[in-house]
């Protein structure tokens, strides 16, 4: 929603608004290619994070339906153009989901994308959400995945180990719970 986001960013950055420095703001996107290219023209030096979550189209489409409209090849090309325009490193966000995108082949593909873009990789273990079939990988698999990405020479790799997932208070877990009564 770039038309709504730009005025909001302007207000956040303005000394008459929140006055937050642009370099302290990271905009995360699912990967709408035309909007990434449009954002590249925005004058403030905000940072960009891409919710990649899969190294190939088949895997990414399971997690990110937007990939059907903007496949990885187009997304990576748009990221390259963003970087060329802005001269800023971007972040590739990658949620690790057991049995879906946590195999070492995906780690190799992720590292390849990161090298091409000279991008930071932020690995995020999935937080279990009631009613969803996905699960967090075992810690040994998370560490193996991270090691493989590093071994493949991704420029920078971080692993976000969040707190609160055991009490449903971590990223992606906060939501309204309602009981539905039948008529």
Predicted segments — roles?
Residues 164-183:
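Radical SAM enzyme core and accessory elements
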Residues 151, 155-165:
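Conserved phosphate-binding/catalytic loops in two-lobed NTP-binding clefts
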Residues 140, 144, 162, 166-169:
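Short, charged alpha-helical segments
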């Amino acid at each position: 929603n770039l038309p709504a986001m730009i005025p909001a960013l302007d207000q956040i950055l303005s000394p008459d608004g929140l006055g937050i420095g642009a370099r302290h703001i990271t905009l995360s996107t699912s990967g709408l290619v035309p909007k990434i290219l449009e954002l590249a023209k925005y004058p403030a030096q905000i940072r960009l994070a891409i919710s990649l979550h899969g190294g190939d189209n088949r895997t990414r489409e399971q997690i990110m339906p937007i990939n059907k409209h903007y496949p990885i090849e187009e997304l990576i090309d748009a990221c390259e153009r963003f970087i060329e325009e802005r001269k800023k490193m971007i972040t590739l966000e990658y949620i690790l989901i057991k049995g879906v995108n946590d195999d070492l082949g995906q780690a190799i593909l992720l590292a390849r994308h990161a090298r091409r873009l000279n991008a930071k990789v932020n690995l995020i273990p999935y937080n279990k959400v009631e009613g969803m079939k996905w699960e967090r990988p075992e810690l040994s698999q998370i560490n193996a995945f991270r090691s493989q990405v590093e071994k493949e020479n991704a420029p920078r790799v971080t692993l976000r180990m969040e707190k609160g997932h055991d009490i449903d208070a971590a990223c992606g877990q906060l939501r309204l719970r309602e009981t539905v009564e039948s008529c």
